[in-house]
Amino acid sequence: MSKVGYTAEFDPATTAKAMAYEINVSPKHCQEICRQIRGMKLSAAKTYLQDVIDKKRSVPFKQHARNVGHKRHQSGWPSGRYPVKASTEILKLLKHAEANAEYKGLETENMRIIHSTSKKGRVIQGIMPRAMGRATAWNIELVTVEVVIGEVR
């Protein structure tokens, strides 16, 4: 297992961070969710992700939008989806970052997500047997997600 660090450096006195290492979710879904929650207040991001899990609000798919249907209630971008599994994992990650901020003595009421990104992790090799003695690759892509929250002044 290789050592994975954060992609950016921030002031540890005013920020708290958390990382989910090699989780089994879609890399494309994580990228779109991280883009959407970046810059949000922590409480608003948690509410937003809970609404995505409940399928009340959708996540706009900007880069991976091929064959993605339009959503009526979404403003600003037509295509979107409801990535429930990835939203659940990122919501857990935000709760961990909030707990880290409370442990450091920071005020969590006015925290904002200043950095969120996803990176490719390992690929677990797998095969699926096919007819006539052939086989198809059936791999599992893992994702590393990192979140940094900071105080708003």
From Swiss-Prot:
Q: Which positions make up the signal peptide? A: none
User: Sorted alphabetically, which keywords does the UniProt record give?
Assistant: Ribonucleoprotein, Ribosomal protein, RNA-binding, rRNA-binding
Keyword Mitochondrion included in the entry's annotation: no
What GO terms fall under cellular component here?
cytosolic large ribosomal subunit
Disulfide bond sites? none
A GO molecular function annotation here is:
structural constituent of ribosome
Entries under InterPro entries matching the protein: Ribosomal_uL22 (IPR001063), Ribosomal_uL22_euk/arc (IPR005721), Ribosomal_uL22_sf (IPR036394)
Q: Quick check: keyword Zinc in the entry?
A: no
Question: What are the GO BP annotations of this UniProt entry?
Answer: cytoplasmic translation
Per its UniProt record, what Pfam families does this chain match?
Answer: Ribosomal_L22
- What's this protein's function? This protein binds specifically to 23S rRNA. It makes multiple contacts with different domains of the 23S rRNA in the assembled 50S subunit and ribosome.
Q: Which family does it belong to?
A: Belongs to the universal ribosomal protein uL22 family.
How this chain assembles, per its entry, is: Part of the 50S ribosomal subunit.
The protein depicted here goes by the name Large ribosomal subunit protein uL22
Q: Which gene encodes it?
A: rpl22
